[in-house]
Protein backbone atom coordinates (compact mmCIF):
# COMPACT_ATOMS: atom_id res chain seq x y z
CA UNK A 1 0.00 0.00 0.00
CA UNK A 2 1.28 3.53 -0.70
CA UNK A 3 2.00 5.89 2.18
CA UNK A 4 -1.15 7.77 3.21
CA UNK A 5 0.21 11.10 2.03
CA UNK A 6 0.23 13.61 -0.80
CA UNK A 7 3.52 15.49 -1.03
CA UNK A 8 4.83 18.62 -2.69
CA UNK A 9 8.30 18.87 -4.21
CA UNK A 10 10.81 21.69 -4.31
CA UNK A 11 11.21 22.89 -7.87
CA UNK A 12 10.83 22.50 -11.63
CA UNK A 13 12.42 19.04 -11.73
CA UNK A 14 13.15 16.36 -9.15
CA UNK A 15 16.47 16.40 -7.36
CA UNK A 16 18.44 13.19 -6.91
CA UNK A 17 17.49 13.19 -3.23
CA UNK A 18 13.79 13.59 -4.05
CA UNK A 19 13.89 10.69 -6.52
CA UNK A 20 15.37 8.37 -3.92
CA UNK A 21 13.12 9.60 -1.13
CA UNK A 22 9.94 9.27 -3.18
CA UNK A 23 10.90 5.80 -4.35
CA UNK A 24 11.25 4.68 -0.73
CA UNK A 25 8.39 6.68 0.82
CA UNK A 26 5.91 5.90 -2.00
CA UNK A 27 3.30 8.61 -1.29
CA UNK A 28 -0.15 8.08 -2.78
CA UNK A 29 0.11 11.28 -4.81
CA UNK A 30 1.72 14.66 -5.38
CA UNK A 31 0.69 18.32 -5.42
CA UNK A 32 2.17 21.10 -7.53
CA UNK A 33 2.50 24.85 -6.92
CA UNK A 34 3.70 27.89 -8.85
CA UNK A 35 7.29 27.04 -7.85
CA UNK A 36 6.94 23.84 -9.88
CA UNK A 37 5.58 25.53 -13.00
CA UNK A 38 7.49 27.08 -15.91
CA UNK A 39 6.14 25.83 -19.24
CA UNK A 40 3.87 23.10 -20.62
CA UNK A 41 6.79 20.93 -21.75
CA UNK A 42 8.52 21.29 -18.38
CA UNK A 43 5.30 20.35 -16.55
CA UNK A 44 4.80 17.27 -18.71
CA UNK A 45 8.34 16.17 -17.86
CA UNK A 46 7.80 16.80 -14.14
CA UNK A 47 4.49 14.95 -13.90
CA UNK A 48 6.01 12.00 -15.77
CA UNK A 49 9.06 12.12 -13.50
CA UNK A 50 6.89 12.04 -10.37
CA UNK A 51 5.01 8.99 -11.59
CA UNK A 52 8.22 7.27 -12.61
CA UNK A 53 9.65 7.86 -9.13
CA UNK A 54 6.92 5.74 -7.52
CA UNK A 55 6.53 3.33 -10.42
CA UNK A 56 2.79 3.82 -10.98
CA UNK A 57 0.23 6.21 -12.40
CA UNK A 58 0.05 8.25 -9.20
CA UNK A 59 -2.39 11.17 -9.07
CA UNK A 60 -0.94 14.67 -9.46
CA UNK A 61 -2.96 17.44 -7.80
CA UNK A 62 -3.02 21.22 -8.12
CA UNK A 63 -5.08 24.20 -6.91
CA UNK A 64 -6.34 25.74 -10.14
CA UNK A 65 -9.50 27.52 -9.04
CA UNK A 66 -8.94 30.53 -11.30
CA UNK A 67 -8.54 34.01 -9.89
CA UNK A 68 -6.12 34.42 -6.97
CA UNK A 69 -5.61 30.68 -6.54
CA UNK A 70 -4.24 29.77 -9.94
CA UNK A 71 -0.86 28.03 -10.25
CA UNK A 72 -0.87 27.90 -14.07
CA UNK A 73 -0.86 31.45 -15.41
CA UNK A 74 -0.25 33.41 -18.62
CA UNK A 75 1.55 33.46 -20.98
CA UNK A 76 1.17 29.68 -21.32
CA UNK A 77 -2.27 29.32 -19.75
CA UNK A 78 -5.48 31.33 -19.58
CA UNK A 79 -6.30 33.78 -16.83
CA UNK A 80 -9.64 33.71 -15.00
CA UNK A 81 -11.38 36.24 -12.78
CA UNK A 82 -12.17 35.26 -9.17
CA UNK A 83 -15.03 32.80 -8.88
CA UNK A 84 -17.27 35.15 -6.87
CA UNK A 85 -16.85 37.92 -9.46
CA UNK A 86 -17.78 35.49 -12.22
CA UNK A 87 -20.84 34.25 -10.31
CA UNK A 88 -22.01 37.84 -9.82
CA UNK A 89 -21.29 39.06 -13.36
CA UNK A 90 -22.23 36.10 -15.57
CA UNK A 91 -25.53 36.12 -17.43
CA UNK A 92 -25.85 32.39 -16.65
CA UNK A 93 -23.59 31.78 -13.62
CA UNK A 94 -23.86 27.99 -13.40
CA UNK A 95 -23.21 27.50 -17.11
CA UNK A 96 -20.25 29.89 -16.87
CA UNK A 97 -18.91 27.82 -13.99
CA UNK A 98 -19.11 24.67 -16.12
CA UNK A 99 -17.39 26.28 -19.12
CA UNK A 100 -14.63 27.81 -16.98
CA UNK A 101 -13.81 24.50 -15.33
CA UNK A 102 -13.99 22.52 -18.57
CA UNK A 103 -11.34 24.89 -19.96
CA UNK A 104 -9.27 24.50 -16.79
CA UNK A 105 -9.56 20.71 -17.01
CA UNK A 106 -8.26 20.77 -20.57
CA UNK A 107 -5.22 22.77 -19.54
CA UNK A 108 -4.49 20.47 -16.60
CA UNK A 109 -4.96 17.19 -18.46
CA UNK A 110 -2.66 18.43 -21.23
CA UNK A 111 0.29 18.60 -18.81
CA UNK A 112 -0.40 15.41 -16.84
CA UNK A 113 -2.32 16.87 -13.88
CA UNK A 114 -5.38 14.77 -13.10
CA UNK A 115 -6.80 16.13 -9.83
CA UNK A 116 -7.91 19.72 -9.19
CA UNK A 117 -8.66 20.96 -5.66
CA UNK A 118 -12.10 22.38 -6.47
CA UNK A 119 -15.03 22.99 -6.05
CA UNK A 120 -15.36 25.09 -2.89
CA UNK A 121 -18.66 24.57 -1.08
CA UNK A 122 -17.91 26.98 1.77
CA UNK A 123 -20.71 29.55 2.08
CA UNK A 124 -20.00 33.26 1.79
CA UNK A 125 -20.88 35.06 5.03
CA UNK A 126 -20.71 38.72 6.00
CA UNK A 127 -17.54 38.10 7.99
CA UNK A 128 -15.80 35.58 5.69
CA UNK A 129 -12.06 36.30 5.72
CA UNK A 130 -10.72 38.09 2.60
CA UNK A 131 -8.30 35.23 1.90
CA UNK A 132 -11.33 33.09 1.08
CA UNK A 133 -14.03 35.59 0.18
CA UNK A 134 -13.77 36.03 -3.60
CA UNK A 135 -12.89 32.36 -4.12
CA UNK A 136 -16.40 31.35 -3.06
CA UNK A 137 -19.56 31.00 -5.15
CA UNK A 138 -21.95 32.99 -2.98
CA UNK A 139 -24.09 33.01 0.19
CA UNK A 140 -27.03 31.04 -1.17
CA UNK A 141 -27.03 27.26 -0.57
CA UNK A 142 -28.80 26.18 -3.80
CA UNK A 143 -26.55 28.43 -5.91
CA UNK A 144 -23.38 27.17 -4.24
CA UNK A 145 -24.48 23.56 -4.71
CA UNK A 146 -25.35 24.12 -8.38
CA UNK A 147 -22.04 25.90 -9.02
CA UNK A 148 -20.10 23.22 -7.16
CA UNK A 149 -21.83 20.48 -9.12
CA UNK A 150 -21.11 22.28 -12.42
CA UNK A 151 -17.44 22.63 -11.48
CA UNK A 152 -17.13 18.95 -10.56
CA UNK A 153 -18.92 17.70 -13.67
CA UNK A 154 -16.84 19.93 -15.95
CA UNK A 155 -13.58 18.71 -14.41
CA UNK A 156 -14.66 15.08 -14.77
CA UNK A 157 -15.66 15.71 -18.40
CA UNK A 158 -12.13 16.99 -18.97
CA UNK A 159 -10.44 13.95 -17.44
CA UNK A 160 -9.69 15.57 -14.06
CA UNK A 161 -10.94 14.50 -10.62
CA UNK A 162 -12.57 17.18 -8.43
CA UNK A 163 -11.85 17.68 -4.72
CA UNK A 164 -14.71 18.98 -2.56
CA UNK A 165 -13.40 21.55 -0.10
CA UNK A 166 -13.19 22.63 2.67
CA UNK A 167 -15.31 20.13 4.64
CA UNK A 168 -17.24 20.95 6.83
CA UNK A 169 -16.94 24.65 5.89
CA UNK A 170 -14.69 27.71 6.29
CA UNK A 171 -17.38 30.31 5.52
CA UNK A 172 -17.70 31.59 9.10
CA UNK A 173 -13.92 31.83 9.55
CA UNK A 174 -12.88 35.40 10.30
CA UNK A 175 -9.15 34.58 10.46
CA UNK A 176 -6.87 33.08 7.80
CA UNK A 177 -6.17 29.42 8.59
CA UNK A 178 -2.81 29.76 6.84
CA UNK A 179 -1.81 32.02 9.75
CA UNK A 180 -4.03 31.11 12.73
CA UNK A 181 -6.72 28.68 13.85
CA UNK A 182 -10.28 29.86 13.09
CA UNK A 183 -12.90 29.18 15.75
CA UNK A 184 -16.67 29.25 15.28
CA UNK A 185 -19.13 29.21 18.19
CA UNK A 186 -22.37 28.79 16.22
CA UNK A 187 -24.88 26.23 17.57
CA UNK A 188 -24.87 22.75 16.07
CA UNK A 189 -28.32 23.17 14.52
CA UNK A 190 -27.20 26.35 12.70
CA UNK A 191 -24.10 24.59 11.39
CA UNK A 192 -26.14 21.60 10.24
CA UNK A 193 -28.74 23.68 8.42
CA UNK A 194 -26.32 26.14 6.82
CA UNK A 195 -22.55 25.50 6.86
CA UNK A 196 -22.72 21.74 6.39
CA UNK A 197 -25.65 21.73 3.93
CA UNK A 198 -23.72 22.30 0.66
CA UNK A 199 -21.29 19.53 1.54
CA UNK A 200 -24.15 17.15 2.26
CA UNK A 201 -25.60 17.93 -1.17
CA UNK A 202 -22.22 17.26 -2.84
CA UNK A 203 -21.24 14.30 -0.67
CA UNK A 204 -21.03 11.95 -3.67
CA UNK A 205 -17.91 13.64 -5.07
CA UNK A 206 -14.89 11.30 -5.14
CA UNK A 207 -12.40 13.25 -3.01
CA UNK A 208 -12.81 15.74 -0.16
CA UNK A 209 -10.51 18.04 1.79
CA UNK A 210 -10.90 18.90 5.47
CA UNK A 211 -10.96 22.38 6.99
CA UNK A 212 -8.52 23.45 9.71
CA UNK A 213 -11.23 25.07 11.84
CA UNK A 214 -12.63 24.57 15.34
CA UNK A 215 -16.39 24.33 15.71
CA UNK A 216 -17.09 24.60 19.44
CA UNK A 217 -20.34 22.68 18.98
CA UNK A 218 -18.49 19.75 17.37
CA UNK A 219 -15.14 19.59 19.20
CA UNK A 220 -13.99 22.66 21.13
CA UNK A 221 -10.49 21.27 21.66
CA UNK A 222 -9.31 20.29 18.18
CA UNK A 223 -9.54 21.53 14.60
CA UNK A 224 -11.66 19.35 12.34
CA UNK A 225 -8.61 17.86 10.60
CA UNK A 226 -7.33 16.26 13.81
CA UNK A 227 -10.68 15.70 15.54
CA UNK A 228 -12.16 12.17 15.55
CA UNK A 229 -15.59 13.67 16.31
CA UNK A 230 -15.36 16.06 13.33
CA UNK A 231 -14.29 13.23 11.01
CA UNK A 232 -17.22 11.16 12.33
CA UNK A 233 -19.50 14.10 11.52
CA UNK A 234 -18.09 14.32 7.97
CA UNK A 235 -18.60 10.59 7.44
CA UNK A 236 -21.92 10.05 9.21
CA UNK A 237 -23.83 13.34 9.48
CA UNK A 238 -22.70 14.88 6.19
CA UNK A 239 -22.49 11.42 4.64
CA UNK A 240 -19.24 11.88 2.73
CA UNK A 241 -17.77 8.45 1.99
CA UNK A 242 -15.18 9.52 -0.57
CA UNK A 243 -11.42 9.73 -0.18
CA UNK A 244 -10.74 12.27 2.58
CA UNK A 245 -7.51 14.29 2.59
CA UNK A 246 -6.37 17.05 4.91
CA UNK A 247 -5.78 20.62 3.89
CA UNK A 248 -2.06 21.42 4.01
CA UNK A 249 -0.76 20.33 7.42
CA UNK A 250 1.93 23.02 7.13
CA UNK A 251 -0.65 25.76 7.74
CA UNK A 252 -0.34 27.67 11.01
CA UNK A 253 -3.85 26.65 12.09
CA UNK A 254 -2.34 23.35 13.26
CA UNK A 255 0.18 22.96 16.06
CA UNK A 256 3.05 20.57 16.73
CA UNK A 257 5.76 19.19 14.48
CA UNK A 258 4.94 17.96 10.99
CA UNK A 259 5.21 14.41 12.33
CA UNK A 260 2.76 15.17 15.14
CA UNK A 261 0.31 16.86 12.77
CA UNK A 262 0.44 13.96 10.33
CA UNK A 263 -0.02 11.37 13.08
CA UNK A 264 -2.92 13.29 14.66
CA UNK A 265 -4.70 13.60 11.31
CA UNK A 266 -4.43 9.89 10.55
CA UNK A 267 -5.49 9.02 14.11
CA UNK A 268 -8.58 11.21 13.69
CA UNK A 269 -9.64 9.17 10.68
CA UNK A 270 -8.61 11.02 7.52
CA UNK A 271 -7.38 8.88 4.64
CA UNK A 272 -4.50 11.05 3.42
CA UNK A 273 -2.20 13.73 4.82
CA UNK A 274 -1.35 16.69 2.56
CA UNK A 275 2.10 18.26 2.97
CA UNK A 276 2.73 21.01 0.46
CA UNK A 277 6.01 22.78 1.21
CA UNK A 278 8.33 20.28 -0.45
CA UNK A 279 11.12 20.81 2.10
CA UNK A 280 13.32 17.90 3.08
CA UNK A 281 12.88 18.15 6.89
CA UNK A 282 9.11 18.34 6.59
CA UNK A 283 8.89 15.52 4.07
CA UNK A 284 11.06 13.29 6.24
CA UNK A 285 8.93 14.04 9.32
CA UNK A 286 5.72 13.26 7.47
CA UNK A 287 7.16 10.01 6.15
CA UNK A 288 8.30 9.01 9.64
CA UNK A 289 4.80 9.42 11.11
CA UNK A 290 2.46 8.45 8.28
CA UNK A 291 1.53 4.79 7.81
CA UNK A 292 0.50 2.98 4.68
CA UNK A 293 -3.05 3.60 3.55
CA UNK A 294 -5.67 1.54 5.34
CA UNK A 295 -7.79 -0.99 3.52
CA UNK A 296 -10.79 1.37 3.72
CA UNK A 297 -8.76 4.31 2.38
CA UNK A 298 -7.40 2.15 -0.42
CA UNK A 299 -10.93 1.17 -1.41
CA UNK A 300 -11.99 4.82 -1.52
CA UNK A 301 -8.89 5.69 -3.56
CA UNK A 302 -9.64 2.92 -6.06
CA UNK A 303 -13.21 4.19 -6.46
CA UNK A 304 -11.98 7.75 -6.97
CA UNK A 305 -9.29 6.86 -9.48
CA UNK A 306 -11.76 4.74 -11.45
CA UNK A 307 -13.36 8.05 -12.46
CA UNK A 308 -10.16 9.17 -14.24
CA UNK A 309 -11.19 8.86 -17.87
CA UNK A 310 -10.03 10.31 -21.17
CA UNK A 311 -11.50 13.78 -21.72
CA UNK A 312 -14.79 13.97 -23.56
CA UNK A 313 -14.52 15.77 -26.92
CA UNK A 314 -14.76 19.55 -26.58
CA UNK A 315 -14.52 22.50 -28.97
CA UNK A 316 -12.10 24.59 -26.91
CA UNK A 317 -12.19 27.75 -29.08
CA UNK A 318 -15.99 27.67 -28.93
CA UNK A 319 -15.91 27.32 -25.13
CA UNK A 320 -13.48 30.26 -24.85
CA UNK A 321 -15.88 32.35 -26.93
CA UNK A 322 -18.87 31.20 -24.90
CA UNK A 323 -17.22 32.15 -21.60
CA UNK A 324 -16.44 35.61 -22.99
CA UNK A 325 -20.10 35.98 -23.99
CA UNK A 326 -21.32 34.79 -20.59
CA UNK A 327 -18.97 37.08 -18.64
CA UNK A 328 -18.30 40.08 -20.92
CA UNK A 329 -16.62 42.11 -18.15
CA UNK A 330 -13.92 39.42 -17.90
CA UNK A 331 -13.18 39.24 -21.62
What are these regions (language model features)?
Residues 1-128, 137, 144, 153-154, ...:
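N-terminal beta-rich core of secreted/periplasmic extracellular enzymes
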Residues 115-139, 166-185:
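Short glycine/serine-rich loop/turn segments
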Residues 35-53, 146-156, 160-297:
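Second-shell residues forming the walls of enzyme active-site clefts
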